[in-house]
């Protein structure tokens, strides 16, 4: 009798485990299909660049950064030049005033 009760418990436990495994497998399958569909949609929307094109874009980026740095250097040079010209203009104004007063 105990053996039968134990067997019933084992059978009930096995049924429960089988049911849970079935539900888990079903849920996993549904999520896998949904993820696969999502990946397909993403793949359609966003085309990946090939290695050559990515390399070319990288080189273009470096070239653009170098050009930008050159422009920044020129701007800095012209700003310094402007400051020097403003100082020279002030000196000339002072000299002009001194010359005008001495006449």
From Swiss-Prot:
Main location: other
Keywords: Coiled coil, Endosome, Transport
Keyword Transport: yes
Pfam families: BLI1
Any coiled-coil regions, as ranges: 51-102
An example Gene Ontology CC term for this record: endosome
Family matches, as InterPro entries: BLI1
Signal sequence, renumbered to the chain: none
Subcellular location: Endosome
Subunit record text: Component of the biogenesis of lysosome-related organelles complex-1 (BLOC-1).
Family note: Belongs to the BLI1 family.
Function noted in UniProt: Component of the biogenesis of lysosome-related organelles complex-1 (BLOC-1) involved in endosomal cargo sorting.
Name of this chain's protein: Biogenesis of lysosome-related organelles complex 1 subunit BLI1
Species, as recorded: Candida glabrata (strain ATCC 2001 / BCRC 20586 / JCM 3761 / NBRC 0622 / NRRL Y-65 / CBS 138)
